[in-house]
Amino acid sequence: VLTYAKLDLWAKFQDFQVRIRNAIVKRQALDRIMIGFNGVKRAKTSNRAENPLLQDVNKGWLQKIREDAPDHVMGSTTKDGATTAGAVKVGKGGDYANLDAVVMDAVNELIDVVYQDDDDLVVVCGRELLSDKYFPLVNKEQDNSEKIAADLIISQKRMGGLQAVRAPFFPAKALLITRLDNL
């Protein structure tokens, strides 16, 4: 948010207009990312109060995948042309024991064979899933050697053998396996 207080603070700088332009360009880019990950429809008039993640501005990347390629969405079922999203349970008694297994299965089963070995594939994931995976490593007393090993594992941020990437405004409990230049 570009407040009056911030404008007043910046007014004394030679690059005042550049700072304003940069703030506007950054906000526009973040809004495009927010729409890309959260957009589900295009409303005639957007309502920011009801759709704080800009869900009604336009269809985003994830929604287009749900609609145009439902067979590439894990947990979804299509019957008579209607696709229903389903939950994928991870953990004891769930569909998968851990997130690594989810990613490996998704790469093997949901991604076309010609793209499965692409070295540029990454897992774009929500903050909560990344935290669920790595929090148990840091939430305990450890010897120095174990702490160093945990730090190394966390710094690599991998899921199912792919680089894990956090993106702003990505849904908290979702995964997207793609190339970053595909977005």
Locations of regions flagged by a protein language model:
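Flexible, glycine/threonine- and acidic-rich loop/arm segments that mediate assembly and lattice contacts
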Residues: V1-D120, R127-E146, D151-I153, F169
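C-terminal structured domain segments
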Residues: K157-L183
